[in-house]
């Protein structure tokens, strides 16, 4: 299983959670929609997001993204010291870090 740094976690103006993996090969994520579980690749933002963001709490969506990338693409997404938090409140950042620190979701 490959480790993949998360370049940024963003909450945009519409409240969507976007997770941008640190990757030179965006085509790896382009077809994540084929998993048919509500995720898609935002080509403009180079990030994974929910097709219908209103269905998800941010913590649940992050868990879903991590599990899908792990199971479908064989990559473990990890926050690093270089991960940018864009439009994310300190409270939400703590919540999302807690979600990720609980180990690999099953």
Task: Give residue spans per PLM region.
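Accessory DNA-engaging acidic/polar modules
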Residues: 1-106
